[in-house]
Amino acid sequence: MLVIPPGLSEEEEALQKKFNKLKKKKKALLALKKQSSSGPASQGGVKRSLSEQPVVDTATATEQAKQLVKSGAISAIKAETKNSGFKRSRTLEGKLKDPEKGPVPTFQPFQRSMSADEDLQEPSRRPQRKSLYESFVSSSDRLRELGQDGEEAEAPGAGDGPPRGFDWSYEEHGSARSSASPPRSRSRDRSHDRSRDRDRDKERDRDRDRDRDRDRDKDKDRDRDRDRDKERDRDRDRDRDRERDREGPFRRSDSFPERRAPRKGNTLYVYGEDMTPTLLRGAFSPFGNIIDLSMDPPRNCAFVTYEKMESADQAVAELNGTQVESVQLKVNIARKQPMLDAATGKSVWGSLAVQNSPKGCHRDKRTQIVYSDDL
C-alpha cells in the first residue's frame, strides 16, 4: 500500500510558486499586445489592418479606380515621355544651352589646382630638350665647330633655316627653348657634354687595352701549347728509336717486313699431277739416300725425306720446276720436319719410328679376308 502525505513537499511548493508567476507574466504580455493592436485603430479611426482588409481582384480594383477618377476623388497618373537614346551629362547640356558661357567650374579632387602664374612658369620648369641638330651631331663635332671666342659656329644650313628634310614642329620648339635658355645653362651643358665625352673616350681606351692584353695572353697560351706538343713528339720519337735499338733484328713490324731466313730440313714437299712412287724414287734417289716417301693422291702431292739435309737442298735446286716423264714438278722444303731428329741420329728410337710410321714405307703384311654374299 502506498501512503501519500496530505501536504505538499518543499519542491512541489517551489514549483507551484513559479507556475503562478509565469501565469501572471503571460497575462501581462497579452494585455500589452492588445494595447499595441488597438493603438493605430483608435488614432486613424478609418484605417484597417492588412489582415482585416478583404482580398480584391485586379478587375474589381481597376473598376473602383475608374469610378474614383470619374468622381474626381483621385487624379489620373500621367506617363512621362522620355527620349530614347544615350544620356547626356548635365555639364554638356548646360554648354549646349548657353554656348557663350565657359565651362562651369567644378570640383575635381584628383586634379592639381593651378593658377595663371603657375601656368606661365610651367614651361620654364620643364627640362629643356635638345634640338634636332644637337641630337644628330655629336658633342666632339660641336667642339670642333666652336670658334676661338668660345661661341658656337653656325650649323650647316642654320642661317637659311632648318634643313629641308628636318622641317618638323619638334625642331621649332627645340630652337625656341634653346633661344629662351640663358647662356650660362648653355655653357654648363657644353662642359657637361665634354666631360661625358672624355669619360667615354677613357672607357673605350680601357676596353681596347683589355682586349689587347687578352689577345696577348691567348697568343702566349697557344705558343706554350705548341711547344708542349713539339716536346711530346720529340719524346715519342726518342722512345721509338730506343725500342728499335733494343729489339734489333728480332723486331717484327708490318711497316718494315724483314726477310725470313731460308728453311732448312731433310723433308721435301713435291707437287705434281699423276705422280707415282716409282717416278719419285727414280727422280730423287740420285741426290741421296731416301729414308721415307709418302703420297697424298687426292691433293697431288708427296713428301720425300732424305738422310741428309745437303741432299735435300741439292734436289730442290735441280728438280724444282723441271718435267720428269711428262709430269711438271714443284719441289720445296716442307714447313714441318717431323723426321729431322731421326734422320740426324739424335734419337735412339728414331730409326724404328721412321720404319714403322703410318706414312712410311712399311706395308701391312696381313691378307684381307673377303666374305661371300651368301653369308
Swiss-Prot record:
Keywords: ADP-ribosylation, Chromosome, Coiled coil, Isopeptide bond, Nucleus, Phosphoprotein, Repeat, Repressor, RNA-binding, Transcription, Transcription regulation, Ubl conjugation. The modification PolyADP-ribosyl glutamic acid is found at residues 122, 151, 172. Residues 90-101, 186-260 have a biased composition (Basic and acidic residues). Residues 266-336 form the RRM domain. GO terms for cellular component: chromatin; NELF complex; nuclear body; plasma membrane. Sequence repeats lie at residues 184-185, 186-187, 188-189, 190-191, 192-193, 194-195, 196-197, 198-199, 200-201, 202-203, 204-205, 206-207, 208-209, 210-211, 212-213, 214-215, 216-217, 218-219, 220-221, 222-223, 224-225, 226-227, 228-229, 230-231, 232-233, 234-235, 236-237, 238-239, 240-241, 242-243, 244-245, 246-247. There is a cross-link at residue 78 (Glycyl lysine isopeptide (Lys-Gly) (interchain with G-Cter in SUMO1)). GO terms for biological process: negative regulation of transcription by RNA polymerase II; negative regulation of transcription elongation by RNA polymerase II; positive regulation of ERK1 and ERK2 cascade; positive regulation of transcription by RNA polymerase II. It is found in: Nucleus; Chromosome. Residues 155-167 have a biased composition (Low complexity). The modification Phosphothreonine is found at residues 276, 278. Phosphorylated by the P-TEFb complex at sites next to its RNA recognition motif, promoting its release from chromatin. InterPro entries: NELFE, NELFE_RRM, Nucleotide-bd_a/b_plait_sf, RBD_domain_sf, RRM_dom. There is a cross-link at residues 78, 82 (Glycyl lysine isopeptide (Lys-Gly) (interchain with G-Cter in SUMO2)). It comes from the Eukaryota. The modification Phosphoserine is found at residues 51, 113, 115, 131, 139, 179, 181, 185, 187, 191, 253, 255, 285, 357. SMART domains: RRM. PANTHER family: NEGATIVE ELONGATION FACTOR E. Belongs to the RRM NELF-E family. The NELF complex is composed of NELFA, NELFB, NELFCD and NELFE. Interacts with NELFB. This is Negative elongation factor E. It comes from Mus musculus (Mouse). The gene is Nelfe.
